[in-house]
Every structure is written in structure tokens, then in C-alpha cells.
């Protein structure tokens, strides 16, 4: 059976990348939370 995770770099960046996060209010909240927590990688784009 086909598994649910079929890795694709472009899809990953477009969905969870920095610019995708910045587009919505909720996404900006995600970044703010991760900054407050002290995450070194805010998004998958920062790898």
C-alpha cells in the first residue's frame, strides 16, 4: 500500500517554508511562537 509521506522538496518549502508562513496571520504567529521559544530553525527553509 502507498504510504502517506511522499517526500518532495518543493512541496515542503511551498507549504512550510518561510514565505508561506509570512503570508498568513496564523503563519506569522507560528514564527513568533518559535522565536519566543528560541528555535534555531524557524521554518524548513532555514536548514
UniProtKB/Swiss-Prot annotation:
The protein's GO terms of the molecular function aspect are: structural constituent of ribosome
Name the keywords, alphabetized.
Ribonucleoprotein, Ribosomal protein
Residue span of region Disordered: 22-47
Which sequence ranges are marked TM in the entry?
none
A GO BP term, please?
translation
InterPro entries assigned: Ribosomal_bL34, Ribosomal_bL34_CS
Q: What is this protein called?
A: Large ribosomal subunit protein bL34
Organism this protein belongs to: Deinococcus geothermalis (strain DSM 11300 / CIP 105573 / AG-3a)
Gene from which this protein is expressed: rpmH
